């Protein structure tokens, strides 16, 4: 990568916004259209510098871009602290825009110059360290290769894209997946996405992240905008990042000693995911750098990478993956995302540094195996991670016999080192046979198997060596790969018989032949004094004895009570004898018809069978008193939870009430004594002579009587509708009032009578 | 002998009546009131005997109100009676005020218990 040396024209601390830079010097920038090896195309990350140019010379497109950058506040309005990531985002977006618009750039005065803003940290004091957002990505776009389509997830991706409510980030991931897998995108899909992309690019209020994703999508879809307004066409403009060293150093400063990276200077947590991101960022910085980055720094980063590989985790089957150690990160990235981010960072970094990274080959292999082994993940984002990583590994050509996505392997010798039966690991049947290569199918095959290969389970061990020695550094091969192989065949079952024997003498009462291959059934009958015997013989096609994995005999009663027995074997002969005398209690004394079912099965047996042989009428004695009942059979779940019997509630019979007339009669009777009282009073000659006549005492007396009447009325109301609390509350007031009035009245009366007495 | 007892009883009754006529009117009023209350209670008991005591609380509250008010009236009579040396210094108005207050409290409780 050839970079021109130029002086940096902006410094960290400026007192005034840089609109016109010192002398308006031009930084040559070069846009890269590398047609690299293997037909890949990579965007280089170009940095741009702003010049002071009069606005009217700008075309509408660049004017909009320029206005985007005119205002320093606008550039950083999304974050008060301008950080490298945002600046880089912006630069990358501009560069990608330029390149995607076929590299047309604006120029002035015949020179190749660019009018888009540089980083001016104008009014802001640049922090010494920069924060890295967690989703900062710069990824090269690689060539794709045909791959087997996985219908479901791809349909999912395209369907959700078609629904037009996607975010640009999701669109980018989806399109990259499609691109790697070589799937064509439908026309209306592309149109819809392009519309959104262009809308984002043209609007001045897009965040840098939106711009980044928009340009990523644009790069894949190659949406072209009709307003191509750059004045002149040039294919070479040099752009780069000034002060790359400082940026590099700052990013590097966030690294930890165990190879992981911190997200920001404020956040002490470190993560492997961030390490991947940081490596990508560093590679971007290096590619953008105007001058050579100090080799010492690069060496330090390589050390970090080695340390990072020390933290790799593995499963037992040889797959490797990266995972986070801490669980309290703000966004927990799974092993998929973490590993893919790390590999992305590694590939980006290795593509920009001059010498090669020495990475442990088996670990890369393990990572590839991990990703191939997880099948198709359900989440679109995981799928993107998987496919992206496989594409990066593919690009770096670091995988085994078939490269990860199925491309051609270089000339190899594949040796079958050993093949042995899994049960007899010491004797290997085949040793050191070299497999021949069929160039048409690109397959290695072994011509002739020895005749002594019988059915069964074997393990084949393969070893691969790259023939061409110079390519050995490019490709990493696994050491010895073990592949389990099952050799299946038809097992012969013959001489099947079922017999009922008398237990005492052992003589055969009835014996019937069974045709296990056919469909016929037999029926026998027995009582509890007899035995039932089933026998047959099994042998492999080559005549050896064969012991199947499963050989069961099952008796099922009419009431669905089942009993299962294992058929024992000796050599080729399989036999089971059921002695009903001993089994009477096990069968719960249930007499009747039992269906017989025979099951013989094994993985290598191509004619496994599960068959109803027939039935046996069993006559068992009566169960004694304390015999165990058969276990309750499972009930149909619908009846178990269905509606139960209805319960009718019996209400308490109401008490007998007296007839209404009687009650009314007695009510009248009860009131009568009151009248009797009044009449008696009159007969006694009650008078109101003592009632005070003068005004004030008279009113008090009246009020006193009224008060008492009011209290009694309150009681009546209390009985009718009031509750105790309101009654008490009212009673309080009334009572106090009555006390006062009564006291007045009665004291007046008392004084009056005292006067009368004394007088 | 029966005749003499009969005559004695009559003589006793007559003397009782004549003595009673000498009591002050206020006391007679109070006596009348007591009689009225007791009579009401009796009628309620008879009713309960006929129809059964289903809402027993109502029966109790009815009977007890009558009995309670009769008791209070008796207390009033004792306190108001001038011949009673014990309550000589208690003004009758005060006794009456007590009577009214206690009745009111009694009837509150009765009303609550009546249901």
From Swiss-Prot, chain B:
Pathway: Protein modification; protein glycosylation
PANTHER family in the record: DOLICHYL-DIPHOSPHOOLIGOSACCHARIDE--PROTEIN GLYCOSYLTRANSFERASE SUBUNIT DAD1
Subcellular location: Endoplasmic reticulum membrane
Transmembrane segment boundaries: 32-52, 56-76, 95-115
BP term (GO), one: protein N-linked glycosylation
UniProt record similarity statement: Belongs to the DAD/OST2 family.
GO cellular component: oligosaccharyltransferase complex
Signal peptide (residue range): none
Domain of life of the native organism: Eukaryota
Protein name per its UniProtKB record: Dolichyl-diphosphooligosaccharide--protein glycosyltransferase subunit DAD1
Topology in membrane: Multi-pass membrane protein
Stretches of the chain found on the membrane's Cytoplasmic side: 1-31, 77-94
Organism: Citrus unshiu
Subunit description: Component of the oligosaccharyltransferase (OST) complex.
One Pfam family named in its UniProt record: DAD
Membrane side Lumenal: residue ranges: 53-55
């Amino acid at each position: 990568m050839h970079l021109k040396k130029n002086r940096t024209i902006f410094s960290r601390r400026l007192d005034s916004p840089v609109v016109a830079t010192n002398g308006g010097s031009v930084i040559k920038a070069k846009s890269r259209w590398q047609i690299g090896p293997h037909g890949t195309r990579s965007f280089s990350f170009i940095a741009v510098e702003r010049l002071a140019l009069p606005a009217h010379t700008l075309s509408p497109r660049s004017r909009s871009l320029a206005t985007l950058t005119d205002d320093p506040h606008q550039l950083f309005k999304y974050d008060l602290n301008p950080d490298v990531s945002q600046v880089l985002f912006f630069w990358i977006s501009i560069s990608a825009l330029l390149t995607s618009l076929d590299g047309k750039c604006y120029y002035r005065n015949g020179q190749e110059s660019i009018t888009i803003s540089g980083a001016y940290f104008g009014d802001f004091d640049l922090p010494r360290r920069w924060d890295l957002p967690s989703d900062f990505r710069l990824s090269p776009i690689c060539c794709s290769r045909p791959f087997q389509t996985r219908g479901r997830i791809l349909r999912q991706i395209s369907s959700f894209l078609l629904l037009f409510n996607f975010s640009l980030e999701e669109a980018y991931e989806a399109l990259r997946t499609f691109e790697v897998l070589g799937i064509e995108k439908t026309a209306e899909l592309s149109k819809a996405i392009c519309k959104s992309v262009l809308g984002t690019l043209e609007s001045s209020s897009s965040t840098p992240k939106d711009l980044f994703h928009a340009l990523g999508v644009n790069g894949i879809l190659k949406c072209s905008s009709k307003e191509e307004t750059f004045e002149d066409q040039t294919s070479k403009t040099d752009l780069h990042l000034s002060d790359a060293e400082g940026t590099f150093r700052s990013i590097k400063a966030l690294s930890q000693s165990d190879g992981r990276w911190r997200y920001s200077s404020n956040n002490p947590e470190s993560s492997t995911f961030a390490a991947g991101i940081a490596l990508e960022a560093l590679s971007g910085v290096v590619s953008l750098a105007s001058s050579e980055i100090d080799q010492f720094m690069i060496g330090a980063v390589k050390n970090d990478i080695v340390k990072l590989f020390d933290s790799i985790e593995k499963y037992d089957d040889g797959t490797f993956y990266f995972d986070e150690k801490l669980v309290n990160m703000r966004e927990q990235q799974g092993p998929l995302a973490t590993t893919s981010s790390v590999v992305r960072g590694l590939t980006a970094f290795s593509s920009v540094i001059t010498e090669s990274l020495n990475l442990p080959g088996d670990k890369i292999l393990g990572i590839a195996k991990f990703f191939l082994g997880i099948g198709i993940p359900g989440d679109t984002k995981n799928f993107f991670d998987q496919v992206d990583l496989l594409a990066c590994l593919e690009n770096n050509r670091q995988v085994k016999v078939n490269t990860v996505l199925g491309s051609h392997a270089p000339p190899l010798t594949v040796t079958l080192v050993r093949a042995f039966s899994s049960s007899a690991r010491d004797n290997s049947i085949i040793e050191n046979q070299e497999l021949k290569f069929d160039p048409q199918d690109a397959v290695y095959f072994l011509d002739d198997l020895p005749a002594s290969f019988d059915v069964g389970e074997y393990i084949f061990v393969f070893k691969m060596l790259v023939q061409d020695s110079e390519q050995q550094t490019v490709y990493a091969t696994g050491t010895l790969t073990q592949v389990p192989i099952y050799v299946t065949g038809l097992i012969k079952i013959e001489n099947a018989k079922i017999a009922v024997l008398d237990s005492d003498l052992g003589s055969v009462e009835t014996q019937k032949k069974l045709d296990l291959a056919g469909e016929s059934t037999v029926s026998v009958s027995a009582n509890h004094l007899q035995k039932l015997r089933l026998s047959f013989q099994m042998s492999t096609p080559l005549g050896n004895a064969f012991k199947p994995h499963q050989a069961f005999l099952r008796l099922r009663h009419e009431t669905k009570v089942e009993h299962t027995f294992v058929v024992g074997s000796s050599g080729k002969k399989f036999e089971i004898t059921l002695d009903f005398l001993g089994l009477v209690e096990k069968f719960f004394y249930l007499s009747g018809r039992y269906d017989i079912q025979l099951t013989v099965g094994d993985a290598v047996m191509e004619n496994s069978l599960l068959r109803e042989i027939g039935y046996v009428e069993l006559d068992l004695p009566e169960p004694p008193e304390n015999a165990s009942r058969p276990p309750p059979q499972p009930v149909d779940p619908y009846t178990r939870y269905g509606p139960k019997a209805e319960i009718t509630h019996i209400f308490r019979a109401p008490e007998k009430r007296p007839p209404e007339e009687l009650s009314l009669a007695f009510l009248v009777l009860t009131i009568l004594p009151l009248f009797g009282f009044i009449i008696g009073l009159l007969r006694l000659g009650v008078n109101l002579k003592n009632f005070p006549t003068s005004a004030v005492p008279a009113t008090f007396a009246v009020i006193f009587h009224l008060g008492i009447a009011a209290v009694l009325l309150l009681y009546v109301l209390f009985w009718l509708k009031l509750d105790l609390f309101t009654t008490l509350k009212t009673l309080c007031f009334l009572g106090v009032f009555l006390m006062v009035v009564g006291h007045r009245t009665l004291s007046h009366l008392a004084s009056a009578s005292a006067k009368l007495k004394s007088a | 002998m029966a005749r003499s007892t009969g005559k004695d009883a009559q003589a006793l009754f007559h003397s009782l009546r004549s003595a009673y006529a000498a009591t002050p009117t206020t006391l007679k009023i109070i006596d009348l009131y007591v009689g009225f209350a007791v009579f009401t209670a009796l009628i309620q008991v008879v009713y309960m005997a006929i129809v059964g005591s289903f809402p027993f609380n109502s029966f109790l509250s009815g009977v007890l109100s009558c009995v309670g008010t009769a008791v209070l009236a008796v207390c009033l009579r004792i306190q108001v009676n001038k011949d009673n040396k014990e309550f000589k210094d208690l003004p009758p108005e005060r006794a009456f005020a007590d009577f009214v207050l206690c009745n009111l409290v009694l009837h509150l409780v009765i009303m609550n218990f009546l249901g």
